[in-house]
Amino acid sequence: KAAPLYDRQLRDLKAADYQQVIDAMVEKGLSRSSCEKQRTLFSQICEWAMAQDIINKNYAMLLQLPAATGKAERTLTAQEIEQISSRQNDPKFGQTAQIAMVLLYTGMRIDELLSMRCEDVHLKERYMQGGEKTEAGKNRIIPILEPIYKIIAFWMLDSGCEWLIPSKAGTKLDKRNVATKFRALMQECHIEGVHPHTLRHTASSKMVECGLEKTAVQAILGHKNFSTTANKYVSHNDPAYLLQEMQKMKY
């Protein structure tokens, strides 16, 4: 689970690095118990490193875990979404707020958005095509709704390279850095108990609440059970149809 840290020096690791592992576990659907065990392991490593004078702080004590099992998974309220939206033009938090809004209006995973290439964005037809490399998730149609159209259009004009949201160096944005900025944005908005994956869950919950057809929701989100029925519902791979369904979604 901590594979991204294997090649790093222990003295260089900070709370954000350990949090990245926890966040990845949450995105994969692992339980709070699994996350607690991973945090305990990180804590033991930090305690050993402190005893060896390698570091001077137990960074594991700063990690945020998902809600306890048995509680309903967290979704953002309309007021919290407005708090995020209001910071889209902020010099410090603007890009992160824009990323959050796109995730809220597409249901994409953060990795999927950061991996999006400009060539896969079709502004005229109002959809993107991408997703994780799974049978149901890869190369799926992701409609672009009006509230995020200008964000996507700006990113396309501003990119200057293959990535839709590149770093200043023209490379793919680092998920760890984005996650760190996301936590800072949540603190700025006084929003607690939220991870990037919460945005996907909020979007999927809103789609269901607003009455989108079940197979359309599955297609847009790339749910694994959609791959077994996709061939029976050819229309659900049609960008115009999926956009029409997504337009039912209102926050």
Could you say what each language-model-derived stretch is?
Residues 14, 34-41, 77, 95-96, ...:
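Hydrophobic (often cysteine-bearing) scaffold residues that line and stabilize catalytic clefts
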